[in-house]
Amino acid sequence: VIVGVPSYNAKFMFVTSEIEITGDAITTDDVNNLIKASVYSKVEQDYELITVLPLTFLIDGEKETKVVGKTGNKLEIKGIMISAPKKNVYSVLSVMEGAGLEVVDITVSALGDYYEVRNNNLDKNIGAIINLGHETTNVSVFSRGKLMNTETIQLGGINVDKDLAYMFNINVFDAREIKEKFASSHKRFIALNDVYEVKNTAGEVIKLNQIEVTEIVMDRLAELLRLAQKQILLLTKQNISYIVITGGLTEIRAFKNLVYEIFGKDVI
């Protein structure tokens, strides 16, 4: 299997290297040696190399896309080295090994987010992907299909659950069900007469209406989206052409209406 490791505290470094071509044509081994040379002595001691994303290959100073099989004297690469804390990597590997699965490669979760939604239009532009996860929210910036930077916000769907549990004195499992099946993401899109009955921690049956539930959910979701919006501005100074939002929280009723209110309508 190929596993994705958490993106938090991942580091991105611009790298470059060049090698002399000794054979008749450039081989896969030449490319592998070039990439290895580009990261030599650049990975910090408590970090693990994840991948190198090539930005440009050059043969004798001329840009090329597919270099294997071509001829030349000097091969050069310019790319982005991605490394992650060893604890992020080994914690995931230990789980996979415990499940009896053989790990053949590792990647950062942000790359997986991109390849889930990738298309020709995204490959040509600069944009951001926001993954609203259970415990964390990952914000990643891509330039023409290349991951340029990523950051993790330590808030996610579980915080919505905890907000509901605290405000209504209910357990977090009931809170999660209310979030998924009853709440709306925006107070303009609610059913005024809908009521949800649930037992609180004292064993009493209470009745919740959509207005009070949605106000709590909307406040937390708006906070998450605004933090993600701010993080995009911190990750890149370039104008972005798209924002993709993924994750379980996007399934809450009227989520797109809240997104449009905060980001505008250029959101997938």
Where are these predicted regions, by residue range?
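Phosphate/pyrophosphate-binding loops at sites that engage ATP/ADP/AMP, CoA/4′-phosphopantetheine
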Residues: 1, 225, 229-242
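Nucleotide/phosphate-binding catalytic cleft detector across ATP-hydrolyzing
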Residues: 1, 5-127, 147-148, 171-172, ...
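Residue-level signature of catalytic and energy-coupling elements of molecular machines
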Residues: 3, 96, 131, 164, ...
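A short acidic Gly-Thr/Ser loop motif
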Residues: 5-6, 129-136, 142-145, 154-158, ...
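Extended, folded domain segments that form the structural surfaces/walls around functional sites
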Residues: 28, 119, 131, 230, ...
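Residue-level detector of high-confidence beta-strand sites
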Residues: 150-152
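A conserved active-site cap/scaffold subdomain adjacent to cofactor or substrate pockets
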Residues: 154-173
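Glycine-rich phosphate-binding loops at beta-strand->alpha-helix junctions
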Residues: 186, 239-262
